[in-house]
Design a protein with these regions (language model features):
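Terminal, regulation- and interaction-focused segments at domain boundaries
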Residues: 1-21
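Ordered, soluble secondary-structure elements with a strong preference for glycine-centered loop motifs
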Residues: 8, 12, 73-77, 116-124
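Ser/Thr-rich, low-complexity intrinsically disordered terminal regions
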Residues: 20, 24-68
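Long, hydrophobic, amphipathic alpha-helical segments used as structural scaffolds
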Residues: 33, 91-94, 98, 137-142
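Short, internal acidic amphipathic alpha-helical interface segments
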Residues: 66-103
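Short, aliphatic-rich beta-strand segments
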Residues: 104-108
Length: 142
């Protein structure tokens, strides 16, 4: 039997850990279902809405940080080029243009395959990484 065929029992939902971290830090949050939570945090340039989604089928915790910055059609090509240049400089996560809403978002995933659990330290590391990058690049995307 290969390691790929072994099924692991996951002790808990990583979103539960995020909810605990958010509550301990007095962050405003909304738990929309068992596998998703959104945290609202104020930044220097705007308010950020950070969604964490647990995707069990790929055993990954996905972070998406959107900010209220709509990209108009005439600027779309320019912004996509800028996103590519910015993404070249990032070690973790990336910026993306969500075409459905024409908003820029920062995305990052934490792979938790084989029954691994997300620690509060990992979660507390993902969030500042997203916010620091959003704050650093916000004005360039305007």
């Amino acid at each position: 039997m290969s390691l790929i065929e072994i099924e692991f029992e996951r002790p808990g939902n990583p979103v539960d850990t995020i909810e605990t971290v958010a509550a301990l830090n007095d962050w405003a949050f909304e738990r929309s279902d068992d596998d998703e939570i959104t945290i609202s945090l104020g930044g220097s340039w705007c308010d950020y809405h950070v969604s964490f989604s647990w995707m069990e089928e790929v055993e990954a915790l996905h972070l998406a940080c959107a900010f209220d910055l709509k990209v108009t059609e005439p600027r779309k090509t320019e912004v996509l080029r800028l996103l590519a240049l910015v993404n070249e400089q990032l070690w973790m996560g990336h910026f993306d243009l969500w075409h459905k809403e024409n908003v820029i978002m920062f995305r990052q995933s934490l792979l938790l395959s084989g029954g691994a659990e997300a620690s509060s330290a990992q979660i507390e590391g993902m969030l500042p990484n997203a916010l620091v990058n959003c704050e650093r690049c916000y004005q360039a995307f305007q």
